[in-house]
């Protein structure tokens, strides 16, 4: 039995049948054109993506975590999204977690066979002490990865919310999740190479999940990352510029309040907008559930 026969990500793309004989310029044009399928796939899944983000936001507001879990490219994309959240939003590294079949070493070197054992998915979730407050997002372009299915089964068994993200219709993993996103960008230019359009599609979905979930818990004011962690010179300068943009003050004033606020962009903004001291700004934020109210 051919288990991959009817999976969208394994089909041949008729537009790239002659990829090996195309000029580089022709192949570049083809690959650019093929990316339009990604946006159409996302538009088609608008409602499902929205439902997932409402669920992740609910989990975060109630003390839960977002857990991405996948194998290969899908697992790496989850890790990429997760590790960017602490510096961008000043959340704990355990707030959004990325897990990959084969462990951390699989991020830079493929661990053959790791994705084929459903029990590994369960064990990886147990290792981070998964709770019913958490939301587990299983990612698999093919929609059938045993590692992901095992993780979703375990998450369901303890009452955690579950999500399946795939790039094929009627994906097997969707049957194991409360919410599912089946975004199908079409066959790859290089047959079966899901690091291409499927990977791009998944990355854009994860971008939306993490960014808009953070918006929902007060990590953004207007469109500014007011909880940015100033860990290098670029981010220190960005922090001061954010204070300028949010309040309309000049750079010198922004820098003064930034330092008075112990280098917290959010607190500096509240101090300026409310003409108050540091302690009062903290109290205002606490009263507003850490949202800036202008």
Curated annotation (Swiss-Prot):
Instruction: Spell out the catalytic residues.
Output: 84 (proton donor), 115
The Gene Ontology biological process terms listed for this entry are: 1,6-anhydro-N-acetyl-beta-muramic acid catabolic process; amino sugar catabolic process; N-acetylmuramic acid catabolic process; peptidoglycan turnover
Pathway(s) the chain acts in: Amino-sugar metabolism; 1,6-anhydro-N-acetylmuramate degradation; Amino-sugar metabolism; N-acetylmuramate degradation; Cell wall biogenesis; peptidoglycan recycling
Give the record's keywords alphabetically: Carbohydrate metabolism, Lyase
GO: which molecular function terms? carbohydrate derivative binding; carbon-oxygen lyase activity; ether hydrolase activity
Subunit: Homodimer.
The entry's function note states: Specifically catalyzes the cleavage of the D-lactyl ether substituent of MurNAc 6-phosphate, producing GlcNAc 6-phosphate and D-lactate. Together with AnmK, is also required for the utilization of anhydro-N-acetylmuramic acid (anhMurNAc) either imported from the medium or derived from its own cell wall murein, and thus plays a role in cell wall recycling.
What's the protein name? N-acetylmuramic acid 6-phosphate etherase
Which lineage is the organism of this entry classified under, starting from the top rank? Bacteria, Pseudomonadati, Pseudomonadota, Gammaproteobacteria, Thiotrichales
Gene of this entry: murQ
């Amino acid at each position: 039995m051919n288990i991959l026969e009817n999976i969208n990500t394994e089909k041949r793309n008729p537009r790239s049948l002659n990829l090996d004989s195309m000029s580089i310029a022709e192949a570049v044009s083809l690959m650019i054109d093929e990316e339009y399928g990604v946006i159409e796939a996302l538009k088609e899944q608008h409602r499902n993506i929205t439902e997932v983000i409402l669920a992740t936001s609910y989990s975060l507001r109630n003390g839960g975590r977002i857990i991405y879990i996948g194998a290969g490219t899908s697992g790496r994309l989850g890790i990429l999204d997760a590790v960017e959240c602490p510096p961008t939003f000043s959340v704990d590294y355990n707030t959004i977690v990325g897990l990959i079949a084969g462990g951390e070493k699989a991020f830079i070197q493929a661990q053959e066979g790791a994705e084929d054992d459903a029990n590994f998915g369960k064990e990886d979730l147990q290792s981070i002490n998964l709770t019913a407050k958490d939301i587990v997002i299983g990612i698999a372009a093919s929609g059938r990865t045993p590692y992901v299915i095992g993780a979703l089964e375990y998450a369901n068994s303890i009452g955690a919310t579950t999500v399946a993200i795939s790039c094929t219709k009627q994906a097997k993993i969707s049957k194991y999740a409360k919410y599912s996103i089946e975004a199908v960008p079409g066959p790859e230019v290089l047959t079966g190479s899901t690091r291409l359009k499927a990977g791009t599609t998944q990355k854009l979905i994860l971008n939306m999940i993490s960014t808009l979930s953070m918006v929902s818990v007060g990590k953004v004011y207007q469109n500014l990352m007011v909880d940015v962690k100033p860990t290098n010179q670029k981010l220190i300068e960005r922090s001061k510029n954010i204070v300028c943009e949010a309040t309309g003050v000049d750079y010198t004033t922004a820098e003064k309040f930034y330092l008075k606020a112990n280098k917290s962009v959010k607190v500096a903004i509240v101090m300026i907008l409310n003409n108050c001291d540091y302690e009062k700004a903290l109290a205002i934020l606490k009263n507003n559930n850490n949202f800036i109210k202008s």
